[in-house]
UniProtKB/Swiss-Prot annotation:
EC number: 2.4.1.18
Cellular component, GO annotation: amyloplast; chloroplast; chloroplast stroma
Inducing stimuli: Induced by light when associated with glucose, fructose or sucrose treatment. Induction by glucose is mediated by the transcription factor ABI4.
Protein name (record): 1,4-alpha-glucan-branching enzyme 2-2, chloroplastic/amyloplastic
Reactions it catalyzes: Transfers a segment of a (1->4)-alpha-D-glucan chain to a primary hydroxy group in a similar glucan chain
Length: 805
């Protein structure tokens, strides 16, 4: 029992836990989902897990033991020898690499063995932020729980490195002798593996259960040496559960497909022959000093009303991203999700890439091409919740409500209509940690944007809560310590095993310690998404220009903790969804339909919209954080909104959400608009490209030098220094200022390096971009020097010393 602020707190974490089930039946016909050759990467190797039947066991033991086959030649399905996982001499008999073989591979590749460093004392957070000392009871308890977790993992699993390789033991694993399939389903009373390979006969391949609730079966090769389950064929696990007989997609399935005419997805046994495996050709880029992220959704990345493919995205969109000047691409909706309109956030199969866009090999090819272009690839990973589907997801997987998720109301997110993980479960930790590692290891993603972190960290999930920044909001009984511990574990695992990997957390609450290393007592993220900025811009755009407050803009953009790196954005995919508007649409509305052609007279609404669109994005990048994000298409002011194809939805309360007749018209990206030199979208795209290249050349987002010298509410002018640059924004709707004096820190000759009024960017060409600006000595706006400029209305101009390299 621990006391925090006078309230007793019983630790919620328990080592054992249980999963959940999904169910559906399949036909008896055999079917392969692969009709052509596909390139690929590497095999998945697995060690043996226990497999004795014990109907009384519902929990995972803290001292896990593993059963391995006695003699595969004599009795491939017999198990008799028991080895403790702590044993250093345990052998895997399924042609798994031995320790010597592994070390040989490590030596051949010149790779050092990867080890997650042990926890520190977690006390440095109090030096970084002295305000945290008031809450040391909570924070010390949190870190104590984390250290205990690490100790238990070291003791019973051989460390975090081994624990995060659950995909080598659970799910399907292939050896020279055959295929082993294991599934953790303690609620099931009986289980069998079914599929095309055995004509869906539930009596053909009955599984056995061990004392920890893990079901297992070994299928020896056919007499001709071929695997018992053909690559590309359908598979499921049939279980007798407390909820009845259920046919479920294996929880660790690596690929799943929805066949034409079928509603639920089918699990696919995915093990292509060597010649079809994609082999990565290009090294992963080093972590960029400043992140400029292009947020993208592969399915909706086509100009045509269709679901786009990994191959098309690789060939058509990646070069565009590179040309625009971004150095990272963040890909949404990678994990398989049966409901396309969920934008990828209702995940059903966590280890499977979305089959709508192609095969796993084609996704690997996409990532490899991005690396060739020097782009870092981040995955939008969803560990905050899961689809509540029982037919093709994790929900009710073994017939129980509390398998992978919390039982009862705590296990449901009423707003998202989804299930919530129990982060205090040992096997849930194994599942999610292994999932993160799988994407890094198998697909070579360079990091993650973790979705919905606020929902994870609080039992109220951030719903109907207005965070004010008061520290009592973060460190009390409404904080889910188990979830925070999981986030610490996954960040420690990622950064320990993949030092160049990047983690970004979507947190709207402003949780202190969020971006402090785990060793120092923090949660361990590299960046926090600065979500308040986008909300502020929408709030501003609903007001008249006369009501915009310069101080309000500056406060929102700079409201972040010292030493906490943030990703700023003016708008992301959230603002583009149906029911909302993009910034461009807020600004220009219906005029976008008729007045974006350069050969047609403009309107005041279009002129205002084009000017403010550029200014909003530049000041967001200039002041908002150490990284920047843009959702695809918004760089050129993509019109309208995103609306995924969907039918009418009837909710449980009887209400109806109208559909759009399954139209793809607003579920695509009209890149042709930004490329057309006869449309005004082109100028917005050119400006965004110039903005990215300016940051690349000057690196201002990661400079420690930032000074706001002018915040003039009467003139509507903001002047600030970031790095070696001086930014001047005139938000006034009519007033332009001649001989306007601005302060600067360094003397010398200045030049214009970016001008939003450039006609190339759809501006009015009111500035001489070849002019030189010489400084005067003497204090002005608290700066040692100053120079005189012309500041046209609704214009942003960036100045740099003329002798900058």
């Amino acid at each position: 029992m621990v006391v925090i602020h006078g309230v007793s707190l019983t630790p919620r974490f328990t080592l054992p836990s249980r999963p959940l089930n999904t169910g559906f039946n399949a036909g008896n016909s055999t079917l392969s989902f692969f009709f052509k050759k596909h390139p690929l990467s590497r095999k998945i190797f697995a060690g043996k897990q226990s497999a004795e039947f014990d109907s009384s066991s519902q929990a995972i033991s803290a001292s896990e033991k593993v059963l391995v086959p006695d003699n595969l030649d004599d009795d491939p399905r017999g198990f008799s020898q028991i080895f403790d996982l702590e044993s250093q001499t345990m052998e895997y008999t399924e042609a798994v690499r031995t320790e010597d073989q592994t070390m040989n591979v490590v030596k051949e590749r010149g790779v050092k063995p990867r080890i997650v460093p042990p926890p520190g004392d977690g006390k440095k957070i109090y030096e970084i932020d002295p305000m945290l000392r008031t809450y040391n009871n909570h924070l010390d308890y949190r870190y104590g729980q984390y250290k205990r977790l690490r100790e238990e993992i070291d003791k019973y699993e051989g460390g975090l490195e081994a624990f995060s390789r659950g995909y080598e033991k659970l799910g399907f694993s292939r050896s020279d002798a055959g295929i082993t399939y294991r599934e953790w389903a303690p609620g099931a009373k009986a289980a069998s593996l079914i599929g095309d390979f055995n004509n869906w006969n539930s009596n053909a391949d009955i599984m056995t259960r061990n004392e920890f609730g893990v079901w297992e079966i070994f299928l020896p090769n056919n007499t001709d040496g071929s695997p018992a389950i053909p690559h590309g064929s359908r598979v499921k696990i049939r279980m007798d559960t407390p909820s009845g007989i259920k046919d479920s997609i294996p929880a660790w399935i690596k690929f799943s497909v929805q066949a034409p005419g079928e509603i639920p997805f089918n699990g696919i046994y995915y093990d292509p022959p060597e010649e079809e495996k994609y082999v990565f050709k290009h090294p992963q880029p080093k972590r960029p000093k400043s992140l400029r992220i292009y947020e993208a959704h592969v399915g909706m990345s086509s100009t045509e009303p269709m679901v786009n493919t990994y191959a098309n995205f690789r060939d058509d969109v990646l070069p565009r991203i590179k040309k625009l000047g971004y150095n990272a691409v963040q890909i949404m909706a990678i994990q398989e999700h049966s409901y396309y309109a969920s934008f990828g956030y209702h995940v059903t199969n966590f280890f499977a890439p979305s089959s709508r866009c192609g095969t796993p090999e084609e996704l690997k090819s996409l990532i490899d091409r991005a690396h060739e272009l020097g782009l870092v690839v981040l995955m939008d990973i969803v560990h905050s919740h899961a689809s509540k589907n029982t037919l093709d997801g994790l929900n009710m997987f073994d017939g129980t409500d509390a398998h992978y998720f919390h039982s009862g109301p705590r296990g449901y997110h009423w707003m998202w209509d989804s299930r919530l993980f129990n982060y205090g479960s040992w096997e849930v930790l194994r599942y999610l940690l292994s999932n993160a590692r799988w994407w890094l290891e198998e697909y070579k993603f360079d990091g993650f944007r973790f979705d919905g972190v606020t929902s994870m960290m609080y039992t109220h999930h951030g719903l109907s809560v207005g965070f004010t920044g008061n520290y009592t909001e973060y460190f009390g009984l409404e904080t889910d310590v188990d979830a925070v511990n999981y986030l610490m574990l996954v960040n420690d695992m990622i950064h320990g095993l993949y030092p160049e990997a990047i983690t970004v957390g979507e947190d709207v609450s402003g949780m202190p310690t969020f971006c402090i290393p785990v060793q120092d007592g923090g949660v361990g993220f590299d960046y926090r998404l600065h979500m308040a900025i986008a909300d502020k811009w929408i709030e501003m755009l609903k007001k008249r220009d006369e009501d915009w407050q310069m101080g309000d803009i500056i406060y929102t953009l700079t409201n972040r903790r010292w030493s906490e790196k943030c990703i700023s954005y003016a708008e992301s995919h959230d603002q583009a969804l149906v029911g909302d508007k993009t910034i461009a649409f807020w600004l220009m509305d219906k005029d976008m339909y008729d007045f974006m052609a350069v050969d047609r007279p403009s309107t005041p609404l279009i002129d205002r919209g084009i000017a403010l669109h550029k200014m909003i994005r530049l000041i967001t990048m200039g002041l908002g954080g150490e990284g920047y994000l843009n959702f695809m298409g918004n760089e050129f002011g993509h019109p309208e909104w995103i609306d995924f194809p969907r039918g009418e939805q009837r909710l449980s309360d009887g209400s109806v959400i109208p559909g759009n007749n399954f139209s793809y018209d607003k579920c695509r990206r009209r890149f042709d608009l930004g490329d057309a030199d006869y449309l005004r979208y082109r100028g917005l795209q050119e400006f965004d490209q110039a903005m990215q290249h300016l940051e690349e050349n000057y690196g201002f987002m990661t400079s420690e030098h930032q000074f706001i010298s002018r915040k003039d509410e009467a003139d509507r002018v903001i002047v600030f220094e970031r790095g070696d640059l001086v930014f001047v924004f005139n938000f006034h709707w009519t007033s332009s200022y001649f001989d306007y004096r601005i302060g600067c820190s360094k003397p010398g000759k200045y030049k214009i390096v970016l001008d939003s009024d450039d006609p190339l960017f759809g501006g009015f060409n009111r500035l001489d971009r070849k002019a030189e600006y010489f400084t005067y000595d003497g204090l002005y706006d608290e700066r040692p020097c100053s120079f005189m400029v012309y500041a046209p209305c609704r214009t942003a101009v960036v100045y740099a010393l003329a002798n900058h390299d």
